[in-house]
A protein has these predicted regions:
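Gram-negative bacterial Sec-dependent N-terminal signal peptides
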Residues: 1-28
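Catalytic centers of hydrolytic enzymes
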Residues: 30-33, 37, 42-71, 112, ...
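Loop/turn elements at helix/coil->beta-strand transitions in domains of secreted/extracellular proteins
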Residues: 30-33, 74-80, 118-121, 143-147, ...
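Short acidic, glycine-rich surface-loop motifs adjacent to enzyme active sites
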Residues: 36-45, 79-90, 181-193, 213-238
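Solvent-exposed loop/turn segments at secondary-structure junctions
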Residues: 40-44, 87-90, 128-132, 153-156, ...
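Binuclear metal-dependent hydrolase catalytic cores centered on His/Asp/Glu-rich metal-binding motifs
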Residues: 47, 56, 161-163, 167, ...
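Core catalytic region of metal-dependent phosphoesterases/phosphodiesterases
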Residues: 67-157, 253
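Conserved beta-sheet core of the metallophosphoesterase superfamily
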Residues: 83, 122, 139-149, 242-305
């Protein structure tokens, strides 16, 4: 008998057996729908705070879709809702909540309040939950007892930090039959690569695979019928630290998982899209080692919908099939309940953003600022050099759609210009290390996302993209003289870079055993006021008026023959 005929016979036999079991009253069948979000980044309602326009984003639209699904449920259906992290950073609403903590009580953060109203069953920590310290995370999530972080380990107890839970065990009903679902939550252990240690003091982050394996064992002992994992990490990438994204590793090591919800990479993954691992392996239908994978982009633009078809025979539940899809919220109305709930904070944020901090006597244009020298990146770099007292500064164009128009400068414009809660560092580097830094930057020229590509201020240089990687910096001069390997410089950079983000520190040879000499630390000097965005605001307030100036200290050539 041929292979296909064998499979067809097995399938027919299985269906016949299930049908017989159902007719004799010994089996139950139904669907578990798991809605998932990830990297919502402070988007509650359908509004873009940077452009001051309505947008197809946010939990309010997600809520509408979920409510519609609830209305269509039958007794054979059940539902779970899970978020995979990066909640407390990303919009000026989040920024307002951080800067005005005296205005709200523990648990009243609008993101976590929205999660409660919508009815989320589990929420996983993302790396941005640690941007503002453990106390802030605890305050924001105080009324949510389902915040997960199994691999966030308390240094004193060597157990899961008490501000989170390793997992939850939910009991739901399908056609009156109890189904116990275990949900494990983990976060990328690479947080020390992009976060200041003071913000996670007292905890450390361990590899996800053994933690999830342990969680599976414990949940099985507690009677879990099926187990889902939600990880704030994505599919492994060749351009990132191997610890940062661990989805393929988790799926290969944990075939017991019925579903793996992932995040962090801001991409959409479902059955319609295959997954390509760094080794070139393609996983058709986004299924790895039998484990279905789903990711729902960012900002609440999509909601993941994973439907698990289950049956129960002789007391045992089995997952027969899983389909995953990412549903766009485009054109979906905001849930008025969520809108009303967040309105006081939304209105306060809008008022906050309209503050005028200075004046521009010309336009600073964001377009192409990631491809050529620009006044907008020069402004950031000059401020970083001035504050840190360094000879050089490196910065990226975080939002090429944001301009500073001629006339009054508002906080809204500056929030759109510098969208992250970064701090500022100054370090010592040699000429050889500086060249390695710039060669590493050249590898990111013309790629996405923009935040990986740094531009240098204080030195003159040329990038020849026609040359092989590692040899593209054909000119590197400081004050008119060629930079020599033994030269010494001071370099300003944000804390994401300083802590290893995008691999620049590794490229220069810095690591835990060979740290750089720090000459400036805005966290130590200024506390929360040391965020780069705040430094930009303070600079413009002091100047009163700024002028767009481009010094044309760098250029990229050889673009047509780029290798």
């Amino acid at each position: 008998m041929g292979k296909n005929n064998k499979l067809r016979t097995l399938k027919v036999t299985a269906i016949a057996a299930l049908t017989a079991a159902i007719t004799t009253g010994t089996a139950f069948a139904g669907n578990l729908t798991v809605f998932s979000t990830s990297d919502v980044h402070g988007s509650v309602i359908g509004w873009n705070y940077f452009t001051a326009k309505a947008a197809d984003v946010g939990l309010a639209k997600v809520s509408t879709l979920i409510n519609e699904a609830r209305g269509q449920q039958t007794k054979d259906d059940a539902m779970l809702i899970i978020d995979a992290g990066d909640i407390l950073q990303g919009t000026p609403l989040d920024t307002y909540m951080v800067q005005n903590q005296d205005e709200w009580q523990a648990g009243d953060h609008p993101m976590f309040a929205a999660f409660r109203t919508i009815g989320y069953d589990a929420i996983t920590c993302g790396n941005h939950e640690f941007n503002f310290g453990l106390d802030y995370l605890r305050k924001a999530s105080a009324k949510n007892n389902n915040l997960l972080g199994a691999n966030v380990i308390d240094k004193k107890t060597n157990k899961t930090w008490q501000g989170v839970r390793p997992y939850v065990l939910k009991t739901i009903k399908i056609d009156g039959e109890a189904l116990k679902v275990g949900i494990i939550g983990t976060v990328t252990p690479a947080i020390p690569n992009f976060e200041a240690p003071v913000h996670y003091q007292g905890v450390h982050f361990v590899s996800q695979v053994p933690v999830i394996q342990q969680g599976i064992k414990e949940l099985k002992k507690q009677g879990a019928d099926i187990i889902i994992a939600a990880t704030h990490s994505g599919v492994e990438r060749a351009d990132r630290d191997s610890a940062e994204n661990q989805v393929v590793s988790i799926a290969k090591a944990c075939p017991e998982l019925s579903l793996l919800i992932c995040a962090h990479n801001h991409v959409v993954i479902d059955n319609t899209k295959g997954i390509k691992a760094p080794d070139g392996t393609v996983y058709k239908d986004a299924v790895i080692n039998g484990v279905p994978i789903v990711e729902s982009g960012k900002d609440g633009k999509f909601v993941g919908k994973s439907q698990l078809t289950l049956h129960k025979v002789k007391g045992k539940w089995t997952v027969e099939k899983v389909t995953t899809q990412a549903i766009s919220v485009k054109g979906v109305a905001d849930d008025p309940v969520i809108t009303a709930q967040v309105k006081p904070w939304h209105d306060k944020t809008l008022k906050y953003l309209q503050q005028t901090v200075g004046e521009a006597d010309g336009a600073f244009i964001g377009a192409e600022s990631n491809h050529q020298d620009s006044a907008i990146v020069d402004l950031i770099n000059n401020i970083q050099r001035e504050v840190a007292g360094t000879q050089l500064s490196a910065a990226a164009a975080f939002n090429t759609s944001q301009n500073i128009e001629k006339g009054p400068i508002t906080l809204q414009q500056l929030s759109g210009l510098y969208i992250y809660e970064n701090y500022l560092y100054g370090i010592e580097v040699t000429g050889a290390q500086l060249r390695k830094y710039m060669e590493h930057a050249a590898n990111y020229y013309g790629t996405s996302p923009d935040y990986n590509y740094d531009m240098l201020q204080g030195a003159d240089y040329t990038i020849d993209m026609s040359r092989p990687k590692g040899t593209r910096i054909t000119k590197l001069q400081y004050q008119g003289k060629d930079v020599k390997d033994a030269d010494k410089f001071t370099l300003a950079m944000n804390d994401y870079r300083f802590n290893g983000g995008s691999g620049y520190m590794e490229a220069m040879g810095f690591n835990e055993n060979n740290p750089p000499k720090v000459v400036y630390d805005s966290i130590k000097e200024l506390g929360d006021a040391g965020q780069v965005r705040s430094l930009i605001v303070d600079y413009i307030k002091k100047k009163g008026k700024i002028t767009p100036v481009v010094d044309h200290n760098w250029q990229a050539v050889g673009l047509q023959s780029q290798k």
